[in-house]
Curated annotation (Swiss-Prot):
Could be involved in the secretion of the yop virulence proteins. It is found in: Cell inner membrane. The chain crosses the membrane at residues 18-35, 42-61, 108-132, 200-220, 235-259, 278-297, 304-320. It comes from Yersinia pestis. One of its GO terms (cellular component) is plasma membrane. Its main location: membrane. The lineage of its organism: Bacteria, Pseudomonadati, Pseudomonadota, Gammaproteobacteria, Enterobacterales. This is Low calcium response locus protein D.
Length: 704
């Protein structure tokens, strides 16, 4: 073969997509076009080869994910097998000849007895259909369900490990991809097992069609005697069934091995795993040897056979037991050296100990970081808080907040605590409580006006204010249907918890942006904006970048538009070194987003304004120091100003269209700091953050 031919073959081998497309087209043509017996023999041999190779792959892979394409392969092989059955059926009925392999298989299995051949075929088919396929199908179904149910918990666990520094960003990304791939694979396997099941049913139908059709054609068209026709076509039919069912059985075994495989960190091939785990229990082998010896003593049983087996199993168990004992003794000796306090290995350890424990390993307290986000719930609420529903709600909240703010919030740890008050829950950040509430058993939380509940005749109990300026009422679950019909908003216990948590996360969002998170966000952008990332890191240090993001998120400004934020850092970073002022310039670069957010997509922005005199008063109270600037108004002026704000704005919860407060850029951050304790939900904007298209709707002017 010349080099040009080899190069051509290499090119074909590289284009696996074309090879698959050609194979699928060939499968379709096999169903339509008649094939000569020689070609059928080749295709049947190929079918068997594929089945054997797939079985070997299933045995030698370390994890099911290493063969994640198996569901698709299962579909292709099933189609190929069915197309082959159609081709052989056509040749059996038309020419009474389906190739040498089919005839040999049939003649060998039938062995001169049609009934025996059919019984053997049925046994193989039933074993495949009822035993292997049915079991594999159930395992795949349960694995798919459990994998999907466990996904939120696994995701939160990965986030928690990443926050705690146990794993880095790349490893977290790999683990998430593995979880997603695992869920998709078992979900696909759940459906793909139906192919194997259907293939077994099709095989049963085809054998009866071939026998009946063959005998009918042989008697009516070919002039054969009924017995002769039955003998001829039964051999061919059973042979056809066997050449189809044997590869199908191998494929079913392959599927069973893959879906029942339990993978772990130290997994190797299936044979090694089984061998390791079997020889790890020498006592079981010793007991098994004794039982085999007892079987050999039963009258009528083949004594010699059972004695030989008992000897082999018993000796194997004894040898493994001796080996295990020697290993245990060696480990104990090593442990005694390590913990002796005077041995050399202990002196070389890095563990720092003191007092009586000096030189002993395992006595030092392990380093443990605080949990970033923790919810303690009264243990009596464990049944009321459905795990799956709560997981779904928590994942939904984290996803929604990420889409709104762009903050990668950590995993949420839920702990049921027996030492809490009835129905009480506490939300903690870094294990410090920041919010608490109460869940009332048998009740739903309703956030509607009293008049609406009274109008519907629904009794209620006043609940505590979960959030400032938001009343809540408890309504018995027996009125749930009436609330639904009246389209009133209500919350289950899981929804109450996640709703309260979402507000807490929004309020403390800046606490979840640190240097590690900033680095993570930059890494996410590096693929598409490499030059921008390089330039911004040259101009703005990572610590300053982190502080800017914290200030933006702290005022409910999303950092998802990282490109615009980084572009603004590059533009203003060299001109302005003060982080606070640099943040103001970046906010002005985000004015289109800010206007859209607070105008609710309209061109009209309801706003309160500060009088010029008030702005000058605040401006004169700003003090500059080496540590930064701050507002130092006299207490009387501060109280007077806050009183005017209260009079002008009033109760924010009673205002339908949420307003903003607009002031000059140089005092905006000081005004925000001044009013946030009482009006946290009132955004403070500067005139530079307004687009030309926005129209201000003045609601009032605040004067002294």
């Amino acid at each position: 073969m010349n080099p040009h031919d080899l190069e051509w073959l290499n090119r074909i081998g590289e284009r696996k997509d074309i090879m698959l497309a050609v194979l699928l087209l060939a499968v379709v043509f096999m169903m339509v076009l008649p094939l000569p017996p020689l070609v059928l023999d080749i295709l049947i041999a190929v079918n068997m080869t594929i089945s054997v190779v797939l079985l070997m792959i299933a045995i030698y892979i370390n994890s099911p994910l290493q063969f994640s394409a198996f569901p698709a392969v299962l579909l292709v092989t099933t189609l190929f097998r069915l197309a082959l059955s159609v081709s052989t059926t056509r040749m059996i009925l038309l020419q009474a000849d389906a190739g040498q392999i089919v005839y040999t298989f049939g003649n060998f299995v039938v062995g001169g007895n049609l009934i025996v051949g059919i019984v053997i075929f049925l046994i193989i088919t039933i074993v495949q259909f009822l035993v292997i396929t049915k079991g594999s199908e159930r395992v795949a179904e349960v694995s798919a369900r459990f994998s999907l149910d466990a996904m939120p918990g696994k995701q939160m666990s990965i986030d928690g490990d990443m926050r705690a520094g146990v794993i880095d960003v790349n490893e977290a990304r790999e683990r998430r991809a593995t979880i997603e791939k695992e869920s998709q694979m078992f979900g696909s396997m759940d459906g793909a097992m139906k192919f194997v099941k259907g293939d077994a049913i099709a095989g049963l139908i085809i054998i009866f069609v071939n026998i009946l059709g063959g005998v009918t054609i042989g008697v009516t068209q070919k002039g054969l005697a009924a017995a002769e026709a039955l003998q001829l076509y039964s051999i061919l039919t059973v042979g056809d069934g066997m050449v189809s069912q044997v590869p199908a059985l191998l494929i079913a075994i392959t599927a069973g091995i893959i879906v029942t495989r339990v993978s772990s960190e130290d997994s190797s091939d299936l044979g090694s795993d089984i061998g390791k785990q079997v020889v790890a229990q020498p006592k079981a082998m010793l007991i098994g040897g004794v039982l085999l010896l007892l079987f050999g003593l039963i009258p009528g049983f083949p004594t010699v056979t059972f004695l030989i087996l008992a000897l082999l199993v018993g000796c194997g168990g004894y040898m493994l037991s001796r080996k295990q004992s020697r290993n245990d003794e060696a480990n104990q000796d090593l442990q005694s050296i390590l913990t002796s306090g005077s041995g050399a290995p202990a002196a070389r350890t890095k563990a720092k100990t003191s007092g009586a424990n000096k030189g002993r390993l395992g006595e030092q307290e392990a380093f443990a970081m605080t949990v970033p986000l923790l919810i303690d719930v009264d243990s009596s609420q464990q049944e009321a808080l459905e795990a799956i529903a709560l997981n779904d709600e928590l994942v939904r909240v984290r996803r929604a907040l990420y889409l709104d703010l762009g903050v990668p919030f950590p995993g949420i740890h839920l702990r049921f605590n027996e030492g809490m008050g009835e129905g009480e829950y506490i939300i903690s950040l870094q294990e410090v409580p920041v919010a608490r509430g109460e869940l009332k058993a048998g009740y739903l939380l309703v956030r509607e006006s009293v008049s609406q509940l009274e109008l519907l005749g629904i009794p209620y109990e006043k609940g505590e204010h979960l959030l400032p300026d938001q009343e809540a009422f408890w309504v018995s679950v027996e009125y749930e249907e009436r609330l639904e019909k009246s389209q009133l908003e209500f919350f289950s216990h899981s929804q109450v918890l996640t709703w309260h948590l979402s507000h807490v996360l929004r309020e403390y969002a800046e606490d979840f942006i640190g240097i590690q998170e900033t680095r993570y966000l930059l890494e996410q952008m590096e693929g598409g904006y490499g030059e921008l990332i390089k330039e911004v890191q040259r101009i703005v240090p990572l610590q300053r970048m982190t502080e800017i993001l914290q200030r933006l998120v702290g005022e409910d400004i999303s950092i998802r538009n990282m490109r615009s934020i980084l572009e603004a850092m590059v533009e203003w970073g060299q001109k302005e070194k003060d982080v606070v002022q640099l943040t103001e310039y970046i906010r002005s670069s985000l004015k289109r987003y800010i206007c859209y957010k607070y105008a609710n997509g309209n061109n009209i922005l309801p706003a309160y304004l500060f009088d010029q005199e008030v702005e000058e008063k605040i401006r004169s109270g700003v003090r500059q120091t080496s540590a930064g600037s701050y507002l130092a108004l006299e207490p009387a002026v501060t109280e007077s100003l806050l009183e005017q704000v209260r009079k002008t704005i009033g109760d924010l919860s009673q205002i339908q269209s949420k307003p903003v407060l607009i002031v000059s850029m140089d005092i905006r951050r000081y005004v925000r700091k001044l009013i946030e304790s009482e009006y946290y939900g009132l955004p403070v904007l500067s005139y530079q953050e307004l687009t030309q298209q926005i129209n201000i709707q003045p609601l009032g002017r605040i004067c002294l």
